[in-house]
């Protein structure tokens, strides 16, 4: 009897499917602990926070008032008032640089150029005796080598990017509504093309209609500029509008 033979067909060689890679970490916070010391008590504002945000990502910090959202943002730039506040432990890395060990001169270089902050009340960020355009131009001059004319032109570009006519460059903060003031602050925050924007409940002081307009503007800028953003908010709805990955603080 003829022996049965099995013929095996060789399968074509295929290259392995590459595994998805996590985005390169832009901001990496590990075990952050921040306390506020008073004569009567110690407030544990942030207790062991871990978070990572990659380039071009958005992350929402969600929590009630007093949950530590603002403290977290201030800690990144070492802006915690000491006393009474103090970073008690943990690590904060930005683009591979240890922010807790950075010298004051280096921190001044980073603030406003690589990392910007948008605070709740725009009036705390705007000087009432200078025009809005000059205040944006000042941020540009602090971090970029350019002429006065070039700084003015770029500041005008920033105003137009956030929906304010260039013709309003020489107007003062009191001539703007609350929502328009916040647009000016946003223009200041993006003037030097930062890698990261820390938005600390920037719509809290605005009415509901203006909140929606500012949120829509931030979403458009996020997509256009590909800037990483952390958005501190309560309630959670704001982070959902901005397509953020929420983190409970």
Model-assigned labels for residue ranges:
Residues 191-195:
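A short, proline-enriched helix->beta-strand linker immediately N-terminal to the Walker B motif
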Residues 87, 99-116, 134, 142:
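ABC ATPase NBD coupling module
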Residues 171-176, 180:
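Conserved ABC ATPase signature
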Residues 91-109, 147, 216:
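ABC ATPase NBD Q-loop/coupling interface
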Residues 94-98, 138, 149-167:
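Conserved ABC ATPase "signature" region
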């Amino acid at each position: 009897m003829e022996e049965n033979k099995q013929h095996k067909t060789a399968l074509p060689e295929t290259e392995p499917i590459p595994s998805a890679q996590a985005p390169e970490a832009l901001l990496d916070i590990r075990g952050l602990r921040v306390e506020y010391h008073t004569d009567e008590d110690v407030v544990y504002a942030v207790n062991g926070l871990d978070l990572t945000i990659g380039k071009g990502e958005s992350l929402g910090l969600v929590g009630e008032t007093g949950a530590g959202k603002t403290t977290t943002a201030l800690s990144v730039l070492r802006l915690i008032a000491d006393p009474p506040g103090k970073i008690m432990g943990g690590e904060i890395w930005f683009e591979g640089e240890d922010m807790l060990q950075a010298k004051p001169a280096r921190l001044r270089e980073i603030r406003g150029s690589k990392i910007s902050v948008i605070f709740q009340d725009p009036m705390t960020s705007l000087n009432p005796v200078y025009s809005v355009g000059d205040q944006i131009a000042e941020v540009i001059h602090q971090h970029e080598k350019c002429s006065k004319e070039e700084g003015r032109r770029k500041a005008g570009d920033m105003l137009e990017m956030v929906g304010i006519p260039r013709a309003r460059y020489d107007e003062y903060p009191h001539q703007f509504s609350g929502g328009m003031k916040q647009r000016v602050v946003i223009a200041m925050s993006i003037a030097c093309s930062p890698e990261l924007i820390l938005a600390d409940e920037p719509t809290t002081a605005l009415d509901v209609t203006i909140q929606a307009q500012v949120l829509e503007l931030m979403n458009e800028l996020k997509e256009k500029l590909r800037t990483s953003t952390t958005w501190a908010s309560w309630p959670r709805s704001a982070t959902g509008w901005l397509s953020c990955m929420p983190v409970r603080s």
